[in-house]
Amino acid sequence: MESLGKAAVAEFVATFALIFVGAGAVIVASSGQLDLVGVALAHGFVLAVMVSVTGHISGGLVNPAVTIALWTAGRIGTQRGAVLIVAQMVGAVLGALLLRY
């Protein structure tokens, strides 16, 4: 269970970072200070870093759709999939909420 807890924290942090940096780049772009290439680079860099950092802990899934696909294909168990999806969703929501305020 300890490794599942670490994986959940890793997925929470990775998904939080992706949403916070990615959506933050979109917000900056909407003010005219960043173009589409900058938004794409922000998403690409944060995703590359988060997958690299969390890959050995949780698999670097970062996206509930990826987790659902792996669960559906039988590559991860139901308990692990459910915990990681919840962690990813909470990370995404908190990342977006932090940008809002």
Segments predicted by a language model, with ranges:
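Membrane-interface helix-loop junctions and terminal tails of multi-pass membrane proteins
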Residues: 1-101
